[in-house]
């Protein structure tokens, strides 16, 4: 996946602490069709011990800047409705809730709603 994203001109960033990975952030097109060529969807993952230190904000700033320079117009975050911290994190960065998809994903043995948040870059 890393090589594919980089070959497509997307960022794939890995954060390290004490020589080990503690977070990653990447993005790709929201949808494959040309009408969505300027709308991206990102993924950000931090280990629990790396949270609350500003690392997530730094990773997001870096991928948003990369996407903006590459011509992206907006960034989408898809967050499980149960992930209140993830939703709050994105809202604090200027993302607005634009949709909720009921029972869109299955995790931990149950169906979960998916929140869609968007930021115009």
Model regions: which residues?
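Aromatic/hydrophobic pocket-lining residues that form π-stacking "cages" and hydrophobic walls in ligand
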Residues: 1, 63, 86
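Acetyl-CoA-dependent GNAT
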Residues: 1-49, 60, 120-121
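Short hydrophobic/aromatic beta-strand or adjacent loop that forms the aromatic wall/cage
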Residues: 10, 112-116
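Conserved active-site alpha-helix within GNAT-family acetyltransferase domains
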Residues: 20, 57, 69, 81-100
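Conserved catalytic-core motifs of GNAT/GCN5-like acyltransferases
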Residues: 26-29, 34, 76-79, 91, ...
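Residues forming the Rossmann-fold NAD(P)(H) cofactor-binding site
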Residues: 53, 57, 61
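Conserved GNAT acetyl-CoA-binding A-motif
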Residues: 60, 67-79
